[in-house]
């Protein structure tokens, strides 16, 4: 059996100091296996987005340990975290965060081009293949501002895969979409997980969306109540 993809041990996140301090995460323990497809459920304010930010190395915990792919990350410096994030983690957000004046292809290859400092022919080939995979080959040269909401989110999915990550963190990826578009995005995530073995942790309020995941974990008041 392979080693876990992610191990979280007694994770605490506190904002502020002294009497005004707010503890958002309260001693979380969590393990994600390679290739898992997991829903993270919980009400607003329960700590879901904070947990995803820490798992994505966008935020440091106050206490606890985070190990991913066997590498301890809590004591890594910013340069090491950026390198690790670019190589191993993809992101899909509720707001797509596409650059409106970039084409669908330019947005897709942005993570690779930014990391390297320039885009290559290989980047364009991979970006084109990813857009074809998400059903947008005919929108490759459209500006993001000209795409529908569902199309923008599919570009965001393609972008999250550009660097072939082992883990994609999706924070309410269907939250701004109608039911049909939400189902199309989830169809993509399910197929990518099945075909590539990419692990997904999907934060959602929607029990219907969560039901399509192979495992559900729940947060309440900064704690995992069902992991």
Outline where the language-model segments fall:
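ABC family nucleotide-binding domain
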Residues: 4-212, 216-219
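Conserved switch/coupling elements of ABC/ABC-like ATPase nucleotide-binding domains
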Residues: 221-227
């Amino acid at each position: 059996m392979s080693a876990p993809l992610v191990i979280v041990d007694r994770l605490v996140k506190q904002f502020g100091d002294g009497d005004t301090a707010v503890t958002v995460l309260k001693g979380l323990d969590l393990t994600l296996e390679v290739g898992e497809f997991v829903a993270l459920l919980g009400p607003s304010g329960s700590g879901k987005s904070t947990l995803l930010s820490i798992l994505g190395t966008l935020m440091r915990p106050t206490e606890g340990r985070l190990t991913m792919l066997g590498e301890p990350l809590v004591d890594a410096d910013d340069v090491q975290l950026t390198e690790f994030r670019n190589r191993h983690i993809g992101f899909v957000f509720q707001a797509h965060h596409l650059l409106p004046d970039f084409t669908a292809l330019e947005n897709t290859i942005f993570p690779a081009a930014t990391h390297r400092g320039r885009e290559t022919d290989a980047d364009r080939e991979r970006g084109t293949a990813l857009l074809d995979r998400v059903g947008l080959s005919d929108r490759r040269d459209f500006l993001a501002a000209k795409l529908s909401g569902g199309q923008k989110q599919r570009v965001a999915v393609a972008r999250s895969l550009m660097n072939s990550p082992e883990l994609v963190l999706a924070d309410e990826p269907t939250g701004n979409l109608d039911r049909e578009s939400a189902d199309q995005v989830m169809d993509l995530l399910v197929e990518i997980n099945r075909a590539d073995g990419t692990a997904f942790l999907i934060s959602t309020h929607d029990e219907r969306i969560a039901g399509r995941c192979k495992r559900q974990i729940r947060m309440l008041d900064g704690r995992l109540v069902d992991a």
